[in-house]
């Protein structure tokens, strides 16, 4: 799910119109939520003690939400 975020963002840049762009960003956001879940599991189980990874995922999620809101307003 982590690598899918970047792949879907890249696809959004080459979307076939605004609706396709929004759809790709929505998929990226869903993948970001899934990645956040896995990072939380790794953190809680002790496999990943670095909060920076989770913080970066949360920050990326905020960027995607903001980008989606802007794209929907300009649709």
Q: What residue ranges belong to the model's regions?
A:
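Short, C-terminally biased terminal segments at protein or domain edges
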Residues: 1-7, 11-75
């Amino acid at each position: 799910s982590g690598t899918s975020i970047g792949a879907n963002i890249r696809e959004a840049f080459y979307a076939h119109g605004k609706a396709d762009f929004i759809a790709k960003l929505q998929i990226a956001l869903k993948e970001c939520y899934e990645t956040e879940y896995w990072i939380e599991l790794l953190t809680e189980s002790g496999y990943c003690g670095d909060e920076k990874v989770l913080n970066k995922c949360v920050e990326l999620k905020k960027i995607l939400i903001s980008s989606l809101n802007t794209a929907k307003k300009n649709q």
